[in-house]
Amino acid sequence: MQFSSYEDLRSRLVSHAITCEEVVRFYLERIENHRGDNIYITVFHDQALERARTLDRKLREGGNPGKLFGMPMAIKDNIAMKNCRLTCASKILENYESVYDATAVLRLEEADAIFLGKTNMDEFAMGSSNENSAFGNVPNPFDKTRVPGGSSGGSAAAVANGLALVALGSDTGGSVRQPAGFCDIVGLKPTYGRISRYGLVAFASSFDQIGVLGLNCDDVALVLGVMAGKDEGDATSSRHPVADYASEMATLSVDGLKIGVPKEYFPETLNPEVSRMVKGKLEELRAQGAELVPVTLPDSAYAIAAYYILVTAEASSNLARFDGARYGYRSEMSEDLAAMYVNSRTEGFGREVKRRIMLGTYVLSAGYYDTYYKKAQQVRRVFQDRYREALDKVDVIAGPTSPFPPFGIGDKTENPLEMYLADVFTVPASIVGMPAISVPLGFDSMNLPVGMHLICNFFEEGKLLGIARHMQRSL
């Protein structure tokens, strides 16, 4: 019982060829068979089956199926679901249950989606390999000695392994797009504010955005359309009208499309096979009528530095709420209140989270605020201006998703700076808040996935998805 797309699944459901319960049982069996891969932190076995029976009954009784009727979905474990565990893959929240639903979850539920469980991730979404999880790392679906990417590695692996049709992730600096590239699937980070962040556990509030991972652009567009739109629960969510993404994708033509190709995205250090495959796809698009336009983004070298100053500063503030006093893990080895705070955080947070909290506290301190944090904010504004200028001249900016294919488990854990460079091509879109997507290009000579990264102007998700769909269909 395999499905190439949601359209394939839906046609079989509404024609009564199969039932939602049969679909859910199929996916739950696959999840059980992959239990050793740590892809799911929590599986909603009974809840998913009950939900499936409810939807089957609705269809039998003549009810109108929702836009996502029967879609089996996975949810990253930093997105709130009422009365379900919300761990953020951290010891400090290991047994915490959310008391409310994220807006994105509510909208998916209203559209008749089915949730199979919560997926593994880097702790508090801090990481690029899924190795920072308190619940163990997740292997790459195509080589179990390698990483699936992060921080939404569990969501990407779930889709790639056929353990969910579509999954939600969160993207702060590439956490949806980079694992999508490493797992040979589509991963979309929408414009900042396109999807409500209400119910998304905050890492860096001015960067965080819920994203979508799927096998194809049509499924991703459908889920995006359901979740997108203003939410009074999130003041940063946008009132910009939600487009008809399917229509925009259908009318997109590659002929005459201007594709910006920054030389900064193809440094000498870029993996040769990644470079060859991305350039090959660009030449293929040129042959189909697109125009390749050289663009210059001279400040690209500062992207990683500015990003890690800004997000760690925000993280040090956001994670102050996890203190052992109100909820979550509390150390039993404390003599007084001050010691309880220190011990709970020391024992509850993993090494990478503590590293980022300390760095963020440092750059916000009185003696270094102007030198680091203020300068990074200025660099962010320069980036926004540069990308606006570039996208005034071209339709899309293209390059690799990652500078290298999936790397080995443990290869970069002892060198945080080398790990951070995995996001060098995805971070700029997060700094400026523009929509970006990773689309599969196929496999290199070692049978490892390679992804291509596309950036469009604010709220041009329809165009972005249309270009990505054309590329994926021409593979």
From Swiss-Prot:
The protein's name in its UniProt record: Glutamyl-tRNA(Gln) amidotransferase subunit A
Entry-linked Pfam families: Amidase (PF01425)
GO cellular component: glutamyl-tRNA(Gln) amidotransferase complex
Family: Belongs to the amidase family. GatA subfamily.
EC number(s) given by UniProt: 6.3.5.7
Catalytic machinery residues: K76 (charge relay system), S151 (charge relay system), S175 (acyl-ester intermediate)
EC main group: ligase
Quaternary data: Heterotrimer of A, B and C subunits.
InterPro entries: Amidase, Amidase_CS, Amidase_dom, AS_sf, GatA
GO biological process: translation
Keyword match rRNA processing: no
Reactions accelerated catalytically: L-glutamyl-tRNA(Gln) + L-glutamine + ATP + H2O = L-glutaminyl-tRNA(Gln) + L-glutamate + ADP + phosphate + H(+)
GO terms of molecular function: ATP binding; glutaminyl-tRNA synthase (glutamine-hydrolyzing) activity
Function comment: Allows the formation of correctly charged Gln-tRNA(Gln) through the transamidation of misacylated Glu-tRNA(Gln) in organisms which lack glutaminyl-tRNA synthetase. The reaction takes place in the presence of glutamine and ATP through an activated gamma-phospho-Glu-tRNA(Gln).
Keywords: ATP-binding, Ligase, Nucleotide-binding, Protein biosynthesis
Gene that this sequence comes from: gatA
